[in-house]
């Protein structure tokens, strides 16, 4: 059974099971030793944290931003064979590859509007006509 060594505490763990290692890493002595380790690391002169004054840190500090990664060919439109492969294809192609026809777009479905229930229809002319008759009847009297 392997023994596990804690570099922060400088001890070999007596319980090498995952539960024993987890319990050790959550302990007070381990946490204080870990904090002390990183504080000592920052105090040493060779370790200088990067300073970005009002700037965003570079994503890839060592690489120039070219749009593509080194070693990769740039992106090309579909259906075009890269220049270096034209003569390297076995059998050789007589010319450029004809373009592939576009994928047909399916016709959109006709929207279905549900019918209203027959009892819910309101006939505005009928209500207006009855209102007109009532007012004319009251004025005629």
UniProtKB/Swiss-Prot annotation:
GO-annotated cellular components: commitment complex; U1 snRNP; U2-type prespliceosome
InterPro entries the record matches: Matrin/U1-C_Znf_C2H2, Matrin/U1-like-C_Znf_C2H2, U1-CZ_Znf_C2H2, U1_snRNP-C, Znf_C2H2_sf
GO biological process, alphabetically ordered: mRNA 5'-splice site recognition; spliceosomal snRNP assembly
Chief location bin: nucleus
Keywords annotated in UniProt: Metal-binding, Nucleus, Ribonucleoprotein, RNA-binding, Zinc, Zinc-finger
Subcellular location: Nucleus
GO MF entry, a single one: mRNA binding
SUPFAM superfamilies: beta-beta-alpha zinc fingers
Zinc finger extent (Matrin-type): 4-36
Pfam families on file: zf-U1 (PF06220)
Keyword Repressor: no
Subunit and interaction comment: U1 snRNP is composed of the 7 core Sm proteins B/B', D1, D2, D3, E, F and G that assemble in a heptameric protein ring on the Sm site of the small nuclear RNA to form the core snRNP, and at least 3 U1 snRNP-specific proteins U1-70K, U1-A and U1-C. U1-C interacts with U1 snRNA and the 5' splice-site region of the pre-mRNA.
HAMAP family in alphabetical order: U1_C
PANTHER family per the UniProt record, alphabetical: U1 SMALL NUCLEAR RIBONUCLEOPROTEIN C
Primary role: Component of the spliceosomal U1 snRNP, which is essential for recognition of the pre-mRNA 5' splice-site and the subsequent assembly of the spliceosome. U1-C is directly involved in initial 5' splice-site recognition for both constitutive and regulated alternative splicing. The interaction with the 5' splice-site seems to precede base-pairing between the pre-mRNA and the U1 snRNA. Stimulates commitment or early (E) complex formation by stabilizing the base pairing of the 5' end of the U1 snRNA and the 5' splice-site region.
Family named by the database record: Belongs to the U1 small nuclear ribonucleoprotein C family.
Protein name (record): U1 small nuclear ribonucleoprotein C
Organism encoding this protein: Theileria parva (East coast fever infection agent)
The organism's taxonomic lineage, starting at the top: Eukaryota, Sar, Alveolata, Apicomplexa, Aconoidasida
């Amino acid at each position: 059974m392997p023994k596990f060594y804690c570099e922060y505490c400088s001890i070999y763990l007596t319980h090498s099971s995952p539960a024993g290692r987890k319990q050790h890493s959550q302990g007070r002595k381990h946490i204080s030793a870990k904090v002390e380790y990183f504080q000592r690391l920052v105090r040493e002169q060779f370790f200088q944290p990067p300073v970005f004054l009002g700037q965003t840190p570079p994503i890839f500090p060592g690489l120039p931003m070219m749009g593509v990664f080194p070693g990769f060919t740039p992106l090309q439109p579909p259906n075009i064979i890269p220049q270096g492969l034209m003569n390297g294809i076995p059998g050789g192609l007589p010319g450029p590859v004809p373009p592939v026809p576009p994928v047909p777009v399916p016709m959109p479905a006709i929207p279905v509007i549900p019918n209203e229930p027959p009892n819910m229809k309101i006939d505005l002319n009928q209500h207006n006509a009855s209102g007109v008759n009532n007012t004319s009847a009251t004025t005629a009297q």
